[in-house]
UniProtKB/Swiss-Prot annotation:
Originating gene: mntP1
Sequence intervals crossing the membrane: 4-24, 42-62, 63-83, 103-123, 127-147, 162-182
Organism lineage: Bacteria, Pseudomonadati, Campylobacterota, Epsilonproteobacteria, Campylobacterales
Species assigned in the record: Wolinella succinogenes (strain ATCC 29543 / DSM 1740 / CCUG 13145 / JCM 31913 / LMG 7466 / NCTC 11488 / FDC 602W)
The entry's keywords: Cell inner membrane, Cell membrane, Ion transport, Manganese, Membrane, Transmembrane, Transmembrane helix, Transport
Function: Probably functions as a manganese efflux pump.
Identification of the protein by name: Putative manganese efflux pump MntP 1
InterPro entries hit by this protein: Mntp/YtaF, Put_MntP
Amino acid sequence: MIELLLLSLALSMDAFAVSLGLGARFGYNKRESLRPALSFGIFQGIMPLLGFFVGVTFIAFISAFDHYLAFGILALIGAKMIYEGLSQSEEERLDELSHRTLLILSIATSIDALAAGVSLHLIDVNVFLSCTIIAFTTFLLSYLGVLWGKRAGEQCKRGAEILGGVILIGIGSKILLEHLFF
């Protein structure tokens, strides 16, 4: 059970970091913070289940390029946020996160959970309970991340969008470097 809790925390860290950036950028209240937290939690819960059932064959195929995909997605969205933070006035900025962008972020931050699902065969745990714990942990940390990010964003106003973009690029770079060198 300890392995499962540690796995849940580890898998939720990327979503937590992205949530900090979203909170800083969009300044969500408690109710609005539920949307990204639910999305990240659901994807983090579904992906290991998918990995568990689809198994080693699919993981071997996707693991050859998943880190490039995650890096590319996060870097593009991060660069877009930085560009908008530097070039747009306060009135020109979008006040909400699009469903499409949230979906892409949810997929990008949960790709590692897909691979982790294969490893659930190696530890003696109930896969459905495991995925539920992973989903709940990610939901909770993402929710807190959005709220804490909002607080940080209130302190740095315009820089919040730039900070959010830098965080996304940083997470993408971390994913890429981990897969290339570790």
